[in-house]
Amino acid sequence: DLFQFGKMIECANKGSRPSLDYMNYGCYCGK
């Protein structure tokens, strides 16, 4: 949903990978 999508983009912005990679693999921040 949009909430999870927004969290993935936020995570991607804090990481080293582009946001598209996070949309493909999911966000693993904090794990």
From Swiss-Prot:
SUPFAM superfamilies: Phospholipase A2, PLA2
Subcellular location: Secreted
Function of the protein: Heterotrimer: Snake venom phospholipase A2 (PLA2) that has presynaptic neurotoxicity. Inhibits nerve-evoked twitch contractions but not responses to cholinergic agonists acetylcholine and carbachol and to depolarizing agonist KCl. Causes a fade in tetanic contractions. Displays a triphasic mode of action with depression, enhancement and blockade of neurotransmission. Does not display myotoxic activity such as changes in baseline muscle tension or inhibition of directly stimulated muscle twitches. All subunits are necessary for maximum toxicity. Monomer: The beta chain has no enzymatic activity and is not toxic by itself.
Subunit structure: Heterotrimer of alpha, beta and gamma chains, each related to PLA2.
Other notes: Preincubation of P-elapitoxin-Aa1a with monovalent antivenom or suramin prevents or delays toxicity, respectively. Antivenom fails to reverse neurotoxicity when applied at point of 90% neuromuscular blockade. Treatment of P-elapitoxin-Aa1a with 4-bromophenacyl bromide drastically reduces enzymatic activity and toxicity, presumably by alkylating a His residue at the active site.
Protein family according to the UniProt entry: Belongs to the phospholipase A2 family. Group I subfamily.
Name of the protein in its database record: Phospholipase A2 homolog P-elapitoxin-Aa1a beta chain
Originating species: Acanthophis antarcticus
Organism placement in taxonomy: Eukaryota, Metazoa, Chordata, Craniata, Vertebrata
